[in-house]
Amino acid sequence: MAGNSIGQHFRVTTFGESHGIALGCIVDGCPPGLEISEADLQTDLDRRRPGTSRYTTQRREPDEVKILSGVFEGKTTGTSIGLLIENTDQRSKDYSDIKDKFRPGHADYTYHQKYGIRDYRGGGRSSARETAMRVAAGAIAKKYLKQEFGVEIRAYLSQMGDVAIDKVDWNEIENNPFFCPDVDKVEAFDQLIRDLKKEGDSIGAKIQVVATNVPVGLGEPVFDRLDADIAHALMSINAVKGVEIGDGFDVVSQKGSQHRDTLSPQGFGSNHAGGILGGISTGQDIVANIALKPTSSITVPGDTINVDGESTQLITKGRHDPCVGIRAVPIAEAMLAIVVMDHLLRHRGQNHGVSTQTPKI
């Protein structure tokens, strides 16, 4: 079956293609009474929006979201929320050269083999343009989580190529176009992007996303563990090739005496687990990292084949991001918010009223 939906109680279904008429989504399960407006959603959409800086694609889309249903007099009604964003800056002619060719490193070949037909304009459904609707839906989840439970979800670019941050200042993230929390690395990121543009090449990136004030108890063992669903959601983001929860792959070189998060009446002694044990939230910060590959949409010639299986070469035309990780920051926030929101509603539905004698630390 088609995989266009995520979540069970808070369910998001998206539709639309990169060069289609519009993008849209349906959000089911949002509790009634939440004050929400298009302006609330637009804030995060503007952070993801293309054409806002010289470091990202110059496709200029206003990404103005319209709320079509599920909101009355400024509040959610508990019914399906319909959202729509019209595409306004398509340049389909930029992709005429790849109509019968497969871009190496993209979904062209696999979509063609799976469906027997593909929308070659900007990648069609496989384009990261689709993630605009995830961000819009995630903004609803973020507002509910923050307003009702004090849960805050934030992310930042922690590495681009070989340039990695040394410190995290949350106040700096929105002060630069890289969502970088280390002001001393902004210039290095800038230089890297300028060099890549001269070379016609691209680079990978790493993003950390954190949820704070998450209640203890979220997650549904065994198959719907919280960390499993987070990994699923983050892995579904375009270009993501790796997901870590907590210390992630660093645990390979750790000993049990180092990795275990000891407990005391004052709380946990560390957070190597990333806020999740046994697939259930501990009440600590949920910490995840994602690795994004360098986009293959570059002007460096590459070998490929056409639809007849014949060898050919391809130089990608169009407007593309030298580092897709930059605009993926609000997308990572949105996907984590959707998962936490879904699990919070699921937990409340089954375990509301559950209490123990053990104090929460």
Swiss-Prot record:
A Gene Ontology molecular function term of the record:
chorismate synthase activity
Pathway-wise, it operates in: Metabolic intermediate biosynthesis; chorismate biosynthesis; chorismate from D-erythrose 4-phosphate and phosphoenolpyruvate: step 7/7
Keyword entries, A-Z: Amino-acid biosynthesis, Aromatic amino acid biosynthesis, FAD, Flavoprotein, FMN, Lyase, NADP
> Mind telling me which Gene3D superfamilies this protein's record contains?
Chorismate synthase AroC (3.60.150.10)
Q: Which residues bind FMN?
A: 125-127, 238-239, 278, 293-297, 319
Q: How is the cofactor bound?
A: Reduced FMN (FMNH(2)).
Q: Where does NADP(+) bind?
A: 48, 54
Q: Which domain of life is it from?
A: Bacteria
Which top EC class is named for this enzyme in its record?
A: lyase
How far does the signal peptide extend, from start to end residue?
none
The protein's matches in PROSITE patterns, at most eight in alphabetical order, are given as: CHORISMATE_SYNTHASE_1, CHORISMATE_SYNTHASE_2, CHORISMATE_SYNTHASE_3
Task: Name the family.
Answer: Belongs to the chorismate synthase family.
- Protein name listed in UniProt: Chorismate synthase
Species of the source: Vibrio vulnificus (strain YJ016)
